[in-house]
Amino acid sequence: MAGKGTQTPPYWYDGSPVPWAMRLLAPLYAGVTALRRRAYRRGWRKRYALPVPVIVVGNITAGGTGKTPLTIALVERLRAAGWKPGVASRGYGREDADKPLWVQADTPTAKGGDEPVLIAWKTGVPVRVDADRVAAGRALVQAGCDVIVCDDGLQHYRLARDIEIEVVDAQRRYGNGRMIPAGPLREPVSRAGECDFRVVNLGQADEESAAQACGFGQWPMALHIDSAQPLAGGRARPLSYFKGQRVHAVAGIAHPQRFFDMLRARGIGVVPHAFADHQAYQPQDLSFGSQLPVLMTEKDAVKCRAFGNDWHYAVPLRAELPAAFWVALTDRLDKLRPN
């Protein structure tokens, strides 16, 4: 099942032939991208620095790779270390995208964007959406933030950054290796090697899988689910409560199968409902003809809170990275802390 949202062309990842028109357009996109990047690198276009450290969490492919779970984990780590983080985002797909906005936990996703609302809901830190990330960063600094985390924005070169973190999906990687629109690449694969940290999103993985999936200089990120929170309020249930039961599983994310597999790994019988990424949900979208429990990702849940009921549950996702990753990152960041 799918609806209004964004769909990934199948030929990006499944090995099927790329339409000839897309092949012709890809070099044009690559050329414009390379020229734009060169303009910033050589100083032909101005870059703007903020008076506080800037960390960009992004990817070189179009679509989701696990940036938001990492951003949330990063914000929580920074706050625990005594920093006052703020998050800057474009707010993909939101209404009135030309108008900057402070995003709160209860901001409608149509106004604030899916990921910014989720980040505000999960962390409570200041979140600013603005097509101009320089302006967003300045607003966050004025609000008292002493470190800025950009959720996405690796290609937004106008904003100078101190640390770049690239996130790539372990299963999809860089797809067919072609530039948009023939493939998923926003920039050549070589761009990933220039980032300060490279994180591989493994989903559920053990240490052996992590070792096999990560090359030199790459850090494994595992995703964990443990509980389900009723959208109508009330106490969370452990996922073990649903073991042996059938549930409707809802995922409107870039890689919905991963969520379904995570639930199945917990012994839950899954009736899958894959929606488009950035799906604009309506109540009828969750009407499946039965009152089996409905388990959904938190990204979907923030768009369904207004009409959620007692059998609709959000499943929180927790990102886990090696302790050495956090040590390396905080060491780099501490060197940027003003004396």
From Swiss-Prot:
One Gene Ontology cellular component annotation? plasma membrane
Q: Look up the record and name the pathway of this protein.
A: Glycolipid biosynthesis; lipid IV(A) biosynthesis; lipid IV(A) from (3R)-3-hydroxytetradecanoyl-[acyl-carrier-protein] and UDP-N-acetyl-alpha-D-glucosamine: step 6/6
Question: Reaction(s) catalyzed by this protein?
Answer: a lipid A disaccharide + ATP = a lipid IVA + ADP + H(+)
Annotated ATP binding lies at T61, A62, G63, G64, T65, G66, K67, T68
What does the record give as the function of this protein? Answer: Transfers the gamma-phosphate of ATP to the 4'-position of a tetraacyldisaccharide 1-phosphate intermediate (termed DS-1-P) to form tetraacyldisaccharide 1,4'-bis-phosphate (lipid IVA).
Read off the NCBIfam families from this record.
lpxK (TIGR00682)
* Protein name listed in UniProt: Tetraacyldisaccharide 4'-kinase
